[in-house]
Amino acid sequence: MSMDHLVRIIEKKYEKKEIPDFRPGDTVRVHVKVIEGDRERTQVFEGIVIAKRGSGINRTFTVRRIGSHGVGVERIFPFHSPVVEKIEVVRKGKVRRAKLYYLRDVKGKIRIKERRD
Protein backbone atom coordinates (compact mmCIF):
# COMPACT_ATOMS: atom_id res chain seq x y z
CA MET A 1 0.00 0.00 0.00
CA SER A 2 1.48 3.34 -1.03
CA MET A 3 1.71 6.38 1.22
CA ASP A 4 -0.60 8.34 -1.07
CA HIS A 5 -3.27 5.67 -0.70
CA LEU A 6 -2.96 5.74 3.11
CA VAL A 7 -3.31 9.53 3.16
CA ARG A 8 -6.51 9.32 1.09
CA ILE A 9 -7.99 6.73 3.46
CA ILE A 10 -7.30 8.94 6.49
CA GLU A 11 -8.63 12.07 4.73
CA LYS A 12 -11.84 10.24 3.82
CA LYS A 13 -12.59 9.84 7.54
CA TYR A 14 -12.53 13.62 8.15
CA GLU A 15 -14.49 14.74 5.07
CA LYS A 16 -17.91 16.29 5.61
CA LYS A 17 -20.76 14.89 3.55
CA GLU A 18 -23.38 17.66 3.85
CA ILE A 19 -21.62 20.43 1.89
CA PRO A 20 -24.02 22.17 -0.54
CA ASP A 21 -23.05 22.79 -4.15
CA PHE A 22 -22.08 26.44 -4.65
CA ARG A 23 -19.86 28.40 -7.03
CA PRO A 24 -18.01 31.72 -7.05
CA GLY A 25 -20.57 34.52 -7.33
CA ASP A 26 -23.04 32.82 -5.01
CA THR A 27 -24.05 34.48 -1.75
CA VAL A 28 -23.58 32.08 1.15
CA ARG A 29 -24.24 32.15 4.88
CA VAL A 30 -21.52 30.32 6.85
CA HIS A 31 -22.25 29.31 10.46
CA VAL A 32 -18.95 29.31 12.36
CA LYS A 33 -18.41 27.88 15.84
CA VAL A 34 -16.64 30.47 18.03
CA ILE A 35 -15.17 29.51 21.41
CA GLU A 36 -14.59 32.39 23.84
CA GLY A 37 -13.16 31.19 27.13
CA ASP A 38 -15.57 28.54 28.39
CA ARG A 39 -18.48 29.69 26.20
CA GLU A 40 -19.28 28.38 22.75
CA ARG A 41 -21.53 30.17 20.28
CA THR A 42 -22.34 30.24 16.57
CA GLN A 43 -21.41 33.27 14.48
CA VAL A 44 -22.91 33.83 11.03
CA PHE A 45 -20.77 35.25 8.20
CA GLU A 46 -22.71 36.09 5.04
CA GLY A 47 -21.12 37.25 1.81
CA ILE A 48 -20.19 36.51 -1.79
CA VAL A 49 -17.94 33.54 -2.61
CA ILE A 50 -15.01 35.03 -4.54
CA ALA A 51 -12.80 31.92 -4.82
CA LYS A 52 -12.65 28.16 -4.31
CA ARG A 53 -9.33 26.36 -4.25
CA GLY A 54 -7.59 23.13 -3.32
CA SER A 55 -8.77 19.55 -3.47
CA GLY A 56 -9.73 16.79 -1.10
CA ILE A 57 -9.66 17.66 2.58
CA ASN A 58 -7.57 20.78 1.92
CA ARG A 59 -10.29 22.55 -0.12
CA THR A 60 -11.06 26.12 0.93
CA PHE A 61 -13.38 28.91 -0.17
CA THR A 62 -13.10 32.66 0.32
CA VAL A 63 -16.14 34.74 1.28
CA ARG A 64 -16.21 38.54 1.03
CA ARG A 65 -18.71 40.91 2.55
CA ILE A 66 -18.88 44.64 3.12
CA GLY A 67 -18.68 45.20 6.87
CA SER A 68 -19.45 48.30 8.88
CA HIS A 69 -18.37 51.70 7.51
CA GLY A 70 -17.96 50.21 4.01
CA VAL A 71 -14.87 48.18 4.90
CA GLY A 72 -14.54 44.91 2.98
CA VAL A 73 -14.00 41.79 5.09
CA GLU A 74 -12.76 38.50 3.63
CA ARG A 75 -12.55 35.15 5.39
CA ILE A 76 -11.11 31.89 4.12
CA PHE A 77 -12.98 28.80 5.31
CA PRO A 78 -11.85 25.18 4.95
CA PHE A 79 -14.69 23.02 3.57
CA HIS A 80 -14.11 20.17 6.02
CA SER A 81 -13.26 22.12 9.18
CA PRO A 82 -15.14 21.18 12.37
CA VAL A 83 -15.37 24.93 13.08
CA VAL A 84 -17.71 25.39 10.08
CA GLU A 85 -21.05 24.07 11.33
CA LYS A 86 -23.24 24.76 8.31
CA ILE A 87 -23.12 26.43 4.88
CA GLU A 88 -26.33 27.83 3.37
CA VAL A 89 -26.65 29.11 -0.19
CA VAL A 90 -28.72 32.31 0.01
CA ARG A 91 -28.56 33.38 -3.65
CA LYS A 92 -27.01 31.96 -6.81
CA GLY A 93 -24.95 34.43 -8.84
CA LYS A 94 -24.10 34.38 -12.53
CA VAL A 95 -20.44 35.23 -13.20
CA ARG A 96 -17.93 34.41 -15.94
CA ARG A 97 -14.83 34.03 -13.80
CA ALA A 98 -13.61 31.38 -11.37
CA LYS A 99 -11.85 33.94 -9.16
CA LEU A 100 -13.67 37.20 -8.42
CA TYR A 101 -10.74 39.15 -7.01
CA TYR A 102 -11.78 42.17 -9.07
CA LEU A 103 -14.61 42.72 -6.55
CA ARG A 104 -11.97 43.98 -4.09
CA ASP A 105 -11.49 47.12 -6.18
CA VAL A 106 -15.16 47.83 -6.96
CA LYS A 107 -16.61 50.81 -5.12
CA GLY A 108 -20.29 51.07 -4.28
CA LYS A 109 -22.90 48.38 -4.53
CA ILE A 110 -21.78 45.25 -6.36
CA ARG A 111 -24.24 43.86 -8.89
CA ILE A 112 -24.11 40.18 -9.72
CA LYS A 113 -26.92 38.78 -11.86
CA GLU A 114 -28.94 35.94 -10.41
CA ARG A 115 -28.50 32.48 -11.92
CA ARG A 116 -31.66 30.49 -12.57
CA ASP A 117 -30.96 26.74 -12.62
From Swiss-Prot:
Gene3D superfamilies assigned to the protein according to its UniProt record, in alphabetical order: 2.30.30.790
Gene Ontology BP terms: translation
Xref: Pfam families: Ribosomal_L19
PROSITE patterns per UniProt: RIBOSOMAL_L19
GO cellular component: cytosolic large ribosomal subunit
Function: This protein is located at the 30S-50S ribosomal subunit interface and may play a role in the structure and function of the aminoacyl-tRNA binding site.
Protein name: Large ribosomal subunit protein bL19
